[in-house]
Structure formats: C-alpha cells, structure tokens
UniProtKB/Swiss-Prot annotation:
Gene field: LARS2
Protein name: Probable leucine--tRNA ligase, mitochondrial
Alphabetical list of CDD domains matching this protein: Anticodon_Ia_Leu_BEm (cd07958), LeuRS_core (cd00812)
Single GO molecular function: leucine-tRNA ligase activity
The enzyme's E.C. designation: 6.1.1.4
The organism of origin for this protein: Pongo abelii (Sumatran orangutan)
C-alpha cells in the first residue's frame, strides 16, 4: 500500500481507500466525519448524486482553507519563469466591503489563478490605501484616534476578503499609513523637490470661518456650507505645495501611443492632458522699478517667438490680485473692471531678460485653465490689438521667406532658425536653466498636493528663516506623525498644534526652524504603490531596481473607470519620473487596463426625491407605490449606497448562495466593463446554479460509468460513437481556444463561462458507451473542470477529488496527485490547429440548409470563388441551375454560404 499512498500524494491527506476484490471495486474506511461535511466525497469517500445548497456549503467549508494553503505554498521566487503581475486597485479601509469590491477582486483572483495554471510566475498583491479624511472625521465624531480606527477596519476587511476565498499575495501586503511605507513616499517627494518638480505657491482653499479650518471639497454641501458648522464656506488663499506634473505632459501624451491595450482609457487620458503645443516661462516681478522677489509663471503656445513679447496678461481672478502678494495693492489700484488695464508692475523674462508690463485683462476667462499668458503680437492678432490699444512696444520676430518657410528674426541666438527648430532649442534652454520650457497644454494644471490634515503623509520639509524651505535629510526619514490625543475639527491643521513636533532645528544651519504642517494628498500614496508591491519589505530603498524591472510593468491593472483619469495620470507621472531617475527601466507602469463597471442596485424614490427602503414599497400592483401613501415611485438602477437603500451585504449573499455561486454570477452577469444590475431573480443567477448542478451531474455519470465494473475499451465504440467522440474532441479544442482568448485578450469572462456551459451541454448529451469507453469524453470532462476552476475553485476542487480516484483512466496527461488548481491549463491539440485541406461548406438556399460540399481550404474564404465553386458542383447544378440568383452571402465565421433566389 505504500506505493499507492505515494502516488495519491495530495489526496492521501484527504482520503483513505482499501482495494478489495480487484482494481475496480473501491471501499472507504469508516471514520468519524464532522457533521458539517457529512455530505461530501472528500470527507466520506462516497459520491452523492445531489448538489444542494448544503452540499455547496459543505464543499466550501472543506476546501476553503485547503485552497488557501495551496496558494501560500506556491513560490514567487523562480525568476526563470515568465511573470504575470495582476493588480486590482487597493481599497480604502472604510470597515466594510461592498459588492464593487467583490467584483474587482473576483476578477483579479480569477485571472491570477488562470495565469498560475499557465505556468506563469504570478503576483496578485493586496494592501490598504489607508490615509484619508474619513479616519479624521471618525476621530472628531467618535473620539477615536485615526490610527486605531483604520487598523480596526483593516483587520475586519481582511477577514471579509478571506471569507470570500480570495487568494492574494498577502506576504506583499502594504499599508500606506505605516511609517515603513510613507518613509518612501517622503523619499520620492524629496527626489521631486531636488529635481525642481515640487514647489510652493498660493492657491485657493475652502475655508470655514467659524471652525477656522480648511475643508475638503466633499466637506462642502450643495449649498456651499460647511458639513460641520453650517457656515457659508469662503475661498481663501493659502501657500500650498504643488508637484509640477506639467513637466511630463508631452512625454505622457506621446507615450499613450505605446499603450495599445488601454481600450477606452487612452482618449480620457489624452483629453485630460490636452494638446501639448506650448510651455510656461518664468518671470520675476518689479513695481516702480524695484525688484519684489516675487515670480509669475505664464503660458505661451508660441515660445519660439518669445523675443516679440509685448506684455504678460493676467486674469482679474489671478492670485496676485487676491492672495497675499506684495503687489496686490498696486495691481488693484490699476484695475478697472471690464477693461484691459496696464499696471505699474513689470515682468522680467528669466530666460531672455526682456522687461514687459503686466496687463490685467478685461475678460475673466483665458484659454483652457490659464490665468496668465504671454502676449506675442507676431503670433496673435488678439495680442496685436491689445498692444496697439495700450501703446505697448514690441518687435516683429517672424519673417516669411518666398517659399513659405517661417524663420525667426531679432531673436538673439535663435535668429535665422525655423520656427520648429527654434521651438525645440528655446524650450530646451529654458528647461536647462529651470525657468520653464516644459512642453504642455493650456488646460493641464500642476498637482496641488497640500492637505491641512493630520491623517496623511507628512511633507518632509523644514522651514528655516535663514535657509528657506529645506528637505529633511534622507537618513532622518521617515518624518512620523506625532501622537495627538484629541481632534476637534477646528482651528486649522492639527499638526500645527503639536508644538514639540513642529519646532525643530534646520538640517542645514542647525538654527531654529519649523516643520511643514501640511500633509500630502492621498493620491500621492497610491501613485507609486504598484512599485512597492514588487519589493515590499525593502528597508533600504522604495524598491530594488532589478526586482522591480522583473515584475514591472503591471500586466493587468483592474479598477473602476472613475479612476481612469486622475489616479492613472498621477501613477503614470510617478513612473515616468522614476524612469528618468534611473530607478526603473520601464517608463509606463501598466500594460493592460480593465476598467470594470459598477454593480447597481434598484432604487425607489418619491417625487420629493426621498429614497425608500424596499420594505416601504408595495410591489403587488402593476407599478411600485409607497406602501403608506400609495404615491407612484420612480424606479431606477443606481450605484449601491446606504443613503439610497439599495446596497447588498456581500457576507449575506455569500451565506445565502455560496462563494462559487456569487463568483460565477458576478463573472457571468455582464462583461467586466459593463454595469451589473443586481437582481438575483434574473437569468444569470439561476443559470450559474444550473451550471454547477450540471457539472456535478456530469461527474456523477462518469464516476458511475467507471465504477460499474466494466473496463473502458475504446475499441468497442461503433463508428457512430467514434464520430460522436470526435465531435466532442473538436468541441473541446474549440472551447479551449476561445476560453483562453477570453482570459488573455478581451477578459470577457462572461463569454468564457458561456463557452464552458456549451461544452458541458455537449457532454451531457453523450451516450453511455462514449462516457464509458471514450478517452475524448474523459479528456473533455477534465478540461472542462480545469477551465472552470479559476472561476469556481471550491466546487471544481471537490469534483476533481472525485475524478482523481476513478479507476482505469484513459488520459495520462493530467497530474492526478495534485488539485485541480495546480493542473496545467489545457492546450489545444496540435492536430486541431492544422487547417484541413478541404472544408465542408454548408450550402443554404433562401436560408434553408440543402447540404454540404467539400471546398478547398485556399478557396473557402473567397466570396466569389466559393460562389462559382458551388454553382459548378453537383449540388449546385441540381439545385441552382437555371434559377435567378440575386447574390450569395459567405459567412465570415463559419463555413456557410447562403443563396437568396427567386423561384
């Protein structure tokens, strides 16, 4: 018996068997079986014919932990294998999963399992986007520290994910609010600062005048009032930190051409960035001939003509007129609403040293999102009119040659260059001097990352009265958050109140200084997390370059379409920056994107706009009405939320239907990019329940056939039965090909399930002789279970346990001593891939099948040749000769041609 135990391997721990009376008689030892698993084969050694809700639950209880343990034993260290990095967007730890989470993580889990079965080295990591405003609100409302609230939520949500049977690479778990993560967020910020890509300027914030604090946009209600105090929110200028994302606009716009798999998202990214045709240039400002130390950045679409500048224009809403600028009074004195106003302020171009006046424009809105632009009459008729109206001096700097070529004149070293060459040379020089020159659009703004919050990554800057803003030395990172005992939601940034933390020494001169009290936008934390997953425990750097280069780019990134613009833009920006810093070799972070749709619930709304709970709705009539008032209700499908009373608790539906059923429902109900209208009464849920039952029944028939005492003998099959088996072989290969394509190319997992349902339907029609004697049936049944396993891992694991111990198998290419999830993904048989020399072409006349004729393969896709071939065939002569044929139609998908004729 020792050799039998060795051969059983994996299943030896599950089952014991005795062989008595020959190889085809199986008896199972008596033993005490836990009550919760009395009905399943893996526990009892007896296959039950019925697949009930209790069976499903017993199967999942038995296999849940075992599947998890299998996954944890798979090594991710074998770099000789091709890799596959599947990443689903990590969640904010709100404390409870919703069905949207279940959908995205079911998709990523399914793809990860599939890729492992293909022999890929796979990571499917999970972590927590753990900083953010809700934790701080909880601190104010419930007197809970943000850290304890967050960690408690993470603990609960991790258990929820585990109960869903999701096998993440938990050893790679990251949490953005932990110092070992945000240390490296701070490190990257300092690298940006050193590269001139992080800077401060004044910007508008939402200000609560009662609580004396800054509000996030989501803390301002639809009436413009504070969520907490109810005060009318004011707009106030504060000095804020920005990341100069415009510096990478052109590179990121151009790189979209290298992302063919970003279906539907590339256009959104391109629109967000805009047409990158110009650049910003920096100016120093003077008033009445005196330098002020202040700077102004302005945009031009024609930087090559910068020597023809007549003025710099600002909008009436510009920060210089409303913030804390020393120029505000001089500018306001010059302002006449509704008129273009010349001011006493002069702007000195930091590249050309030209000095031109600042003009306040009459119009409030400039092009794109601009609030300042450079006036160049040589390239703008509007600028010409304004300069002439205000009597401003300027030079014509563009001359047109007889052949139409435009060249520069009166433009210092750029004189004589074509406009195109001058554009490149001048912007390059500006970038080299760090006075602008980054090619960008007139609509893209730099990224404001300052938040006047506690629960965020501290900005690692010290403000020194002597040295100015000074980055914290890298060896002193992380700058950790101080422990603040209570939160009131009043009085500005909580960090500003932590005097012991704020007051420090300047890293440069060692004099008295103060820490920056703003924290970073949480989008900064999530802009580089995909890198950290590749090397999550590295204490010396954000990630090891060689390790990141192996895993990157992410092969498939899955998340909601609502993140298709801002988050992806910021993530791409950080990846481009890290590439330029020689930290990684790949510029783009994500190869393929899958933007999954929402799961929507049904809502019932009164004419007043109030949403009702389902218990308040009378559904007995032809239209839903309010149970009390009998008012007619507006019925819609909307994103699930508590306020709309249309949410579904994932734990409740899993308890009711089982994990595999919910997984299959989510995957089958709609293509992943489409919305799902959650309604368990639709065809989708009954369909996947029936399909699981069919898989179980197919297995039962096969086990019974092989346990009948008869040995399988393929030579006993009749010609008709051999033809039946051949069709199963063809069907199996066709399904393998199509399902593999769905898993690797379009991710239409609903279509993959449909294909597998079709194969199970074909197998259920098989005759008893084919089931017993045909290797084709056995192979197709096993391939079906292997292909279904990534989507329904529990039920297929149980089925495979039953199949594994069926005696006298005819297929030797499966590894029977390991579970179904460790099988190799089925491959299409080479014979199936060989195109036949002759195709059997189905001929239809007026949509009625009339027979088939053999057509040479090289002719079968040519409409005209097939048409003539059919007419000259015996069938064509007999059925079509002398009849009026309008036109024939050759199917692009199948070997079929239809002849509409007039009798």
């Amino acid at each position: 018996m020792a050799s039998v135990w060795q051969r059983l391997g994996f299943y030896a721990s599950l089952l014991k068997r005795q062989l008595n009376g020959g190889p085809d008689v199986i008896k199972w030892e008596r033993r005490v079986i836990p009550g919760c698993t009395r009905s399943i084969y893996s526990a009892t050694g007896k296959w039950t014919k019925e697949y009930t809700l209790q069976t499903r639950k017993d199967v999942e209880k038995w296999w849940h932990q075992r599947i998890k343990e299998q996954a944890s034993k798979i090594s991710e260290a074998d770099k000789s294998k091709p890799k596959f990095y599947v990443l689903s967007m990590f969640p904010y730890p709100s404390g409870k999963l919703h069905m949207g989470h279940v959908r995205v993580y079911t998709i990523s889990d399914t793809i990860a399992r599939f890729q492992k079965m293909r022999g890929m080295q796979v990571i499917n990591p999970m972590g927590w986007d753990a900083f953010g405003l809700p934790a701080e609100n909880a601190a104010v409302e419930r007197n809970l520290h943000p850290e304890s609230w967050t960690q408690s939520n993470i603990k609960h949500m991790r258990k929820q994910l585990d109960r869903l049977g999701l096998c993440f690479s938990w050893d790679r778990e990251i949490t953005t609010c932990l110092p070992d993560y945000y240390k490296w967020t701070q490190y990257l910020f300092i690298k940006l600062y050193e590269a001139g890509l992080a800077y401060q300027k004044e910007a508008l914030v939402n200000w609560d005048p009662v609580d004396q604090t800054v509000l996030a946009n989501e803390q301002v209600d639809e009436h413009g009032c504070s969520w907490r105090s109810g005060a009318k929110v004011e707009q106030k200028y504060l000095r804020q930190w920005f990341i100069k994302t415009t510096a990478y606009a052109k590179a990121m716009q151009d790189a979209l051409a290298d992302l063919p798999e970003w279906y539907g998202i590339k256009g959104m990214q391109a629109h967000w960035i805009g047409d990158c045709v110009g650049c910003h240039l920096d100016f120093t400002l003077k008033v009445h001939g005196q330098a002020t130390g202040e700077k102004l950045t302005a945009y031009t679409a024609t930087p090559e003509a910068i020597y023809g500048t007549s003025h710099v224009a600002i909008s009436p809403s510009h920060r210089l007129l409303h913030g804390h600028s020393s120029l505000k009074e001089a500018l306001r004195m010059a302002l006449v609403p509704g008129k273009d106003c010349l001011t006493p302020v002069m702007a000195v171009n930091m590249l050309t040293q030209q000095e031109v006046p600042v003009v306040i424009l009459a119009k409030a809105d400039l092009e794109g999102s601009l609030d300042s632009k450079i006036g160049i009459p040589s390239t703008s008729s509007e600028d010409t009119i304004l300069a002439q109206t205000l009597g401003l001096a300027y030079s014509e700097v563009i001359e047109t040659l007889p052949d139409g070529t435009e060249r520069l004149s009166s433009s210092a070293e750029f004189t004589g260059m074509t406009r195109q060459d001058a554009f490149l040379a001048l912007t390059q020089k500006a970038r080299g001097k760090r006075v602008g020159g980054d090619v960008t659009s007139d609509k893209l703004k730099d990224w404001l990352i300052s938040r006047q919050r506690y629960w965020g990554t501290p900005i690692p800057i010290v403000h020194c009265p002597v040295c100015g803003p000074t980055p914290v030395p890298l060896e002193d990172l992380p700058v950790t958050l101080p422990n603040i005992a209570s939160f009131t939601g009043k009085g500005g940034s909580p960090l500003a109140m932590a005097s012991e933390w704020v007051n420090c020494s300047c890293p440069r001169c060692k004099g008295a200084a103060k820490r920056e009290t703003d924290t970073m936008d949480t989008f900064v934390d999530s802009a580089w997390y995909y890198f950290r997953y590749t090397d999550p425990h590295n204490p010396h750097s954000p990630f090891n370059t060689a390790v990141a280069d192996y895993w990157m780019p992410v092969d498939l990134y899955i998340g909601g379409k609502e993140h298709a613009v801002m988050h992806l833009f910021y993530a791409r920006f950080f990846s481009h920056f890290c590439h330029d810093q020689k930290m990684v070799k790949h510029r783009e972070p994500f190869h393929k994107l899958l933007a999954q749709g929402l799961i929507k619930g049904q809502t019932f709304r009164l004419p007043s706009g109030q949403y009702l709970q389902r218990e308040e709705v009378d559904l007995t009539g032809s239209v839903p009405v309010h149970a009390k008032t009998k008012e007619k209700l507006e019925v819609t499908w909307e994103k699930m939320s508590k306020s709309k009373h249309n949410g579904v608790d994932p734990e409740e539906v899993v308890e009711q239907y089982g994990i595999d059923t919910i997984r299959l429902y989510i995957l089958f109900a709609a293509p992943p990019e489409k919305d799902i209208l959650w309604d368990v009464k639709t065809d989708a849920l009954p369909g996947v329940l029936r399909w699981q039952q069919r898989l179980w029944t197919l297995t039962t028939r096969f086990i019974e056939a092989r346990a009948s005492g008869k040995s399988p003998q393929p030579q006993l099959l009749s010609n008709k039965e051999k033809a039946e088996a051949r069709k199963l072989w063809e069907y199996k290969n066709s399904v393998i090909s199509q399902v593999t394509t769905h898993f690797t190319e379009d991710f239409s997992l609903n279509s993959a399930i449909s294909q597998l349902m079709g194969l199970s339907g074909a197998l259920s029609q098989a005759s008893q002789s084919v089931i017993l004697h045909s290797p084709e049936f056995e192979d197709a049944l096993c391939a079906l279970m292997v292909m279904a396993a990534p989507m329904a891992p529990h039920v297929t694991s149980e089925i495979w346990a039953g199949l594994a111990l069926v005696p006298r198998k005819l297929c030797a290419h499966y590894t029977w001593d390991v579970s179904v999830l460790l099988q190799a993904w089925p491959a299409v048989d080479p014979e199936f891939l060989q195109e036949p020399e002759v195709v059997q072409m189905a001929v239809l006349i007026n949509n009625k099948a009339c027979g088939k004729i053999p057509v040479p393969q090289q002719v079968a896709r040519d409409q005209d040749k097939v048409h003539e071939f059919v007419l000259q065939s015996e069938l064509g002569v007999r059925l079509l000769q002398g009849r009026s044929i309008k036109k024939s139609f050759l199917s692009p998908r199948t070997a079929l041609i239809n002849f509409p004729v007039q009798d």
